[in-house]
């Protein structure tokens, strides 16, 4: 289960929340299924103030499962699994980037 950390706010542009987790498994379409529960992320937005870091990679925003993003877009979403999922729409992110279960994931907003 993911741990939530609250960071002190020093500027209005500084993130105030961080949740750390791991990639728990790889889904049937090659998406990364994390240990971060969707419920923890309800206050995180879909804009550039939210960053999702996983290994050496990053995307912005946490979108609903039915995000409607076009093919080849890197997206973090509240997955059907009940946990944060990271995908490249229409492509196996696990195969394309060589990412395996066990790697770190961090969401800040």
PLM features: residue spans?
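Charge-biased, low-complexity intrinsically disordered regions
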Residues: 1-109
